Regions:
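Cap/insert and terminal regions of metallo-dependent hydrolase folds
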Residues: 197-309
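Di-metal (Zn2+ and/or Mg2+/Mn2+) metal-binding site signature of metallo-dependent hydrolases
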Residues: 63-104
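Short internal beta-strands
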Residues: 106-114, 273-275
């Protein structure tokens, strides 16, 4: 699955599911020729922008800023056009809350449950001032909540992208979201935290797979962001996440949807960015390498797995 040119750029602001608080889930995405981004989750913002800028991952942005000494706040305020929050757990919204005092007016897009949790439990004048457009007064209206309708595509203001949300389950009683990002006929799919279908009463991941299978068949899907929180966990200890075994099971099932006759060929060369890798205080930095080793061992689909580092720039 090769392409003549790349369609998207991704800046990795945070790729971990913890426990370190300065590298939490957040990815900026924009068309390859544009620096007008949306944020897919917002666990780390300014700390990730700082690392990415020092790595040289932002192409051409320094020339746009009138003050090179303030480049990171400029990127946060002026180049991040909107936030798409998959769910309201702290490792996906911490940067949004903490950095709100440095931000400017823009929308937060999320499904109803995520917005309700942000409104009632974070931006509420008890945990944090209410910088948003609903909830406990006074409303500061820095962030405007935009409630997403499932599977309805919306166009993102001040960007060249549209986004279509799909429902996921982070556990039996907690909703999460997948976002299908589109620009000029090309797509990238971002999964928020998700439980494997085998442990859920409804097949949420299968539903997403059926909807996007034609995009793989037409080679217009440029990449998938998919969590792999652990190397290996007992099912009772997954807590609404995927480990390598369950992630590969979902990908094999997806391959069968894309190409029932030759599933082993269906996803060959597809870029899958591994996200939400959780650190282990006992194993130190080896957790990520153990995931990499196990993915290499189990990858019988020819997928191009990408295990990002904070601050990386990835082209899809």
């Amino acid at each position: 699955m090769s392409f003549s040119k790349e369609a998207f750029q991704v800046i990795v602001l945070g790729c971990s599911g913890g426990p370190k608080e300065d590298n939490l889930s957040s990815y900026l995405i924009a068309p390859i020729h544009s620096n007008d981004f949306i944020a897919l989750d917002a666990g780390s913002l300014l700390s990730g922008i700082d690392k990415a800028y020092k790595k040289g991952s932002f192409k051409g942005i320094s020339e746009e800023s009138s003050n090179p000494w303030q480049i990171e706040p400029y990127i946060l305020r002026d180049k991040v056009k909107a936030y798409f929050i998959s769910h309201a757990h702290l490792d996906h919204v911490l940067g949004l809350v903490i950095n709100s005092t440095e931000d400017i007016k823009k929308p937060i897009f999320a499904i109803d449950s995520a917005i309700d949790f942000l409104r009632d439990h974070l931006f509420n004048w008890k945990i944090w001032p209410n910088f948003a457009s609903e909830g406990n007064p006074p409303l500061l209206n820095l962030y405007e909540y935009q409630r997403l309708e499932l599977e309805r595509k919306i166009f993102v203001p001040n960007t060249e992208m549209s986004v279509q949300p799909f429902l996921l389950s982070h556990s039996r009683n907690y909703e999460s979201t997948a976002f299908l990002v589109e620009s000029k006929g090309f797509y990238a799919l971002y999964f928020g935290d998700t439980a494997p279908d085998i442990l859920e009463p409804r097949k949420y991941m299968e539903n997403v797979g059926k909807k996007i299978a034609p995009l793989v068949q037409s080679r217009s899907l440029r990449g998938i962001f998919l969590e792999c929180s652990y190397v290996d966990k007992e099912e009772s200890q997954l807590f609404g996440h995927l480990d390598v075994k369950h992630m590969m099971r979902e990908l094999r099932h997806f391959a069968c949807i894309v190409n029932p006759i030759s599933p082993q060929e269906a996803l060959k060369g597809l870029k899958v960015i591994i996200i939400h890798m959780k650190g282990d205080s006992l194993k130190g930095d080896f957790s990520k390498e153990l995931i990499r080793i196990e993915l290499d061992r189990q990858n019988d689909l020819g997928i191009e797995f990408i295990l990002p580092e904070q601050g990386d720039r990835i082209e899809l």
